[in-house]
């Protein structure tokens, strides 16, 4: 098992950090850490953004480091070309131990309030919640979804609003597609959902999600596995799909098929520049477009499945 990792560090303007982090996450296939965001706060209103962020990616020490550095530098050069006048420093490489890597991202993951009542708390923290808080304990491990990223926050905020708007006696079925850490599925249960299904194509993400479900005593209340969307039985009153824009468009027919009449569909993981691509992909007479929410460079869209004529 690898105990030493190559850490590649890039300093970049804050408004491009998410784009770089997404690229490095796909390139490394392991982990990415974004720093210089003051998350030592209980409300997103208190978060302070710095002008420059530091994005760190981790690779096995067996990797061809020169080849990886060249790929990353080429990506940074393309970013600079798209933003005239932008100067991006060359990446810095260092070697870290596994335990150092773990400490690095933990230092930047603090309790976070999302929406009106949701409080996301890492397992190593114990903040005093307000009486009506819905506390979700989380150890994200290598899976995406701490609640700090814009795409996850958008989903959580919209989920809370949708669930609060449901009739009191209704316990809706909820699907969390691309569950990552399991945070959306856990929030759905705590917000009053009945059947909750969480799926991800990444077995490691499913394992992390199951561990987080156990931390919150929700193992028996969420079906969590790698079942493909097309193989899931039944329909859902709420579907949360926080995945890449291109995948959302590809899965549009299946998502609509799994959404019950009158059900709500939340699409996230969409860069603002991909918004029209997704809007076109979901231009279906069975769906009513409801709204678009924006945070930073990211958007989330809400649709409702209309009754058949």
UniProtKB/Swiss-Prot annotation:
SUPFAM superfamilies given in the database record: S-adenosyl-L-methionine-dependent methyltransferases
GO molecular function: protein-lysine N-methyltransferase activity
Keywords: Cytoplasm, Methyltransferase, S-adenosyl-L-methionine, Transferase
Class of this enzyme: transferase
Pfam families for the chain: PrmA
Residues that coordinate or bind S-adenosyl-L-methionine: 152, 178, 200, 242
GO CC terms: cytoplasm
Predominant location category: cytoplasm
Catalytic activity: L-lysyl-[protein] + 3 S-adenosyl-L-methionine = N(6),N(6),N(6)-trimethyl-L-lysyl-[protein] + 3 S-adenosyl-L-homocysteine + 3 H(+)
CDD domains: AdoMet_MTases (cd02440)
Enzyme Commission number(s): 2.1.1.-
GO-annotated biological processes: methylation
Family: Belongs to the methyltransferase superfamily. PrmA family.
Role of this protein: Methylates ribosomal protein L11.
Name under which the protein is recorded: Ribosomal protein L11 methyltransferase
Organism: Pelobacter propionicus (strain DSM 2379 / NBRC 103807 / OttBd1)
Lineage: Bacteria, Pseudomonadati, Thermodesulfobacteriota, Desulfuromonadia, Desulfuromonadales
GN (gene name): prmA
